[in-house]
Each structure stands twice: as C-alpha cells, then as structure tokens.
From Swiss-Prot:
Belongs to the UPF0377 family. This is Putative UPF0377 protein YIL174W. It comes from Saccharomyces cerevisiae (strain ATCC 204508 / S288c) (Baker's yeast).
Amino acid sequence: MPIIGVPRCLEKPFCAPAKFPFSVKKNIRILDLDPRTEAYCLSLNSVCSKRLPCKKYFYLLNSYNIKRVLGVVYC
C-alpha cells in the first residue's frame, strides 16, 4: 500500500554540482562513494531507487558533468 502524498518517482529532480574523487564513466550505474550515501544513475526525467524510500543523495551522470540530487523516491 503506497503512502499518501509521496510520489512513486521523483520527476524533474533539482540538482546541484558535485565533485567526485575519481574518474567517472558514462556507463556506471551505481557508485559507492560514501558508506553514508548511495548513488544511482538517473534519467533526465525521473529518479528511481531499488530500495525502500528514504532521504538520500542521488547522482546524475552524463557525458559532460555530474550533478547531485537530493530527494525522496518510491518505486
């Protein structure tokens, strides 16, 4: 049963620049950056995690830059 008032996926996520301590390739899907956070490859229109919903940092990967997205997602 879904929780009322919480979207199943975050659409048009807000982003902020993020720096990585290593080279990132476009085909990386999940990054282990910090034991306290989890990173996922996001699409431009939606964010979906593979775990129970909670507040996390998500990382958008593309060919030119990397952006950080903070959001709560349900999928």
